[in-house]
Amino acid sequence: QDKYKVYIDDKSIALPKKEFELLSLLSSKPDKVFRREKIMEKVWGEKVIVGDRTIDVHIRKLREKIGDKYFKTIKGVGYKFIIEE
């Protein structure tokens, strides 16, 4: 159970596997814009067909759990992770 936990401001937050994988991908290269297609491929796999809204829903859930300030939507392209100053 502990393997999908993140720590924000000394607070432990448990995440479902896909949310954790999405956060892990985006935070691996802060300020890099990840295209939706690349996110789908890396998190869900090339063989899995998921709707466009799937990524949006997972990002929304991450924003609710760890904070909106960490994610930026690049309209029509994808998302990027932002580290606080």
Say what each PLM segment does.
Residues 81-85:
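C-terminal edge and immediately downstream basic/flexible tail or linker adjoining helix-turn-helix-like DNA-binding
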